[in-house]
Amino acid sequence: MLFRSVRCVCDALGYPGKFEVLLGQLVNLLRNGKPVRMSKRKGTMVTLQELVDEVGSDAARYTLISKSSNQMVDFDIEAVKKRDNSNPVYYVQYAHARVCSILRRAADVTAEQADEMGMKAVAAKAIGENVDYSLLTDPTELALSRKLNELTDLIASCARDRAPFRLTHFAEELAGDFHSFYAACQVLPSEGRPVDPELSRARLAACDAVRVTLALVLTLVGVSAPEQM
């Protein structure tokens, strides 16, 4: 009855056929893998506000949106509070914060330091213009580029199919590709480990693209993108 009333209101306001009802499945609340027992008769229950107060709005929103509306959600309270890579929301947010840290370090490289390390233009202000992306030939760099190129089509499919959970899967895959890239490829010069200036700029540009993409995806699902963690 309520849905019918809302549909009539939408029709009257000039939006015929625009009202959609998407029903989600049950959420199984767990703590350390064990079900949290609730009972209407006994009055024992956990409200959404209580859940958000305990785990935080980012963890709650990300976990609930990370499944298709056709799937039940197993929400383990202790698991989503963990600050390690086993927690998907932490994993993605940490990747964003790590990229921001790299870009801050690049901005702190002075001209004198850059010259000493065999670099001429490493600072963040030097990236973005006239970058030679053809220098990115490492398999991890290519995998990262391919993943970044999926975003536009992904957003369109999420909107078309009412499937925002795909954004969380994409973010986790992108975070994984970034960590693999950063482990395999030196981005900034260090003492005794110079990097070709143009290659460094290209890698910094790739890092910045990851930052922008992760921030956009997290914003789309209503989750913050911290610059420090």
What is each model feature region?
Residues M1-M229:
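Non-catalytic interaction-recognition regions
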